[in-house]
A protein has these predicted regions:
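N-terminal leader/linker segments that precede catalytic domains of diphosphate-processing enzymes
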Residues: 1-270
Length: 270
């Protein structure tokens, strides 16, 4: 493929055939107020998608968090070499989902480690606060406060084996991934009870109906809720199943868990 050189735009030049995704995953955990068991909270999103004149609804159960943000693309280019965003949307939102020359992979790791250690600042935003706040608002319709939880960095997970992405903006592109991991321990018993009540109230089928109804009313065709599960129960299940290394979801208690949930579960084994 020959593409016109475009700096840090969205049109890749020849040789820019590695997609790198840097994401933030937050393990939201709390003690069940009734029995003291450790619970894991996950986000459930339901989206109505139109394709070829037909509509379908996709329900995803995934960790809280989102993409790391590039704060200073020019400085990042000085550090890792030229790059291109994987899509116009990633560029608009400054998401760290980029196409690079494979030879610059190690430079990206260095920059990420420097930001985690505090040696370098101002190039990448690894804070999970914005995403957490938005996702709690979407699911529970509340304003998450800093005093409601304590945030602990858990390091960086590197997935340097190439796998094709299922991201709709760059489907099938060979991708390496970096995850910045955090624990968010909830402090508010009121919030814990709200999460568990929300999890029990809405089934995945309910979320599908809500997304369809939202689309009919002219909305974006979306609905959000939470899922709270026993962390130990989910860990036992995860350890009992075979993993093929692909981006394949897991079916747990009738819920399809996104493949990146495993990054949170493997934290418990460290």
């Amino acid at each position: 493929m020959n593409y016109e050189q475009g700096g840090s735009g969205t049109e890749p030049s020849e040789g820019f055939n590695l997609r790198v995704s840097v994401g933030i995953l937050v393990r939201v955990i709390f003690k069940n107020p009734e029995n003291e068991k450790i619970m894991l909270a996950l986000e459930r999103t339901s989206t109505s998608i139109k394709s070829e004149g037909k509509s379908r609804v996709v329900v995803r159960t995934k960790p809280f968090g989102g993409g790391a943000r590039i704060l200073n693309p020019n400085e990042l280019m000085n550090l890792i070499g030229d790059f291109h965003y994987d899509s116009g949307r990633s560029q608009e939102e400054s998401d760290f989902r980029i196409l690079v020359n494979p030879g610059n992979w190690e430079k990206i790791l260095v920059v990420c480690r420097e930001h985690l250690s505090g040696k370098r600042v101002g190039v990448i935003d690894f804070s999970p606060v914005r995403e957490l706040t938005e996702e709690f608002q979407d699911s529970l319709h509340i304003q998450l406060r800093s005093q409601d939880y304590s945030l602990t960095p858990r390091g960086m997970r590197i997935e340097d084996e190439l796998t094709p992405t299922e991201n709709v903006n760059a489907p099938g592109f060979p991708t390496k991934r970096i995850y910045i991991l955090y624990d968010a321990w909830l402090k508010s018993s009121v919030l814990m009870k709200m999460i568990m009540a929300n999890s029990s109230k809405y089934s995945d089928a309910n979320l599908e109906e809500m997304a369809c109804e939202d689309a009919k009313k002219g909305g974006k065709g979306r609905a959000n809720a939470m899922l709270s599960v026993s962390l130990n129960q989910l860990l036992d299940f995860y350890r009992s199943v075979q993993h093929d290394g692909k981006e394949s979801p897991m079916l747990f208690m009738g819920h399809q868990l996104e493949w990146n949930v495993r990054a949170l579960l493997e934290l418990s084994d460290e």
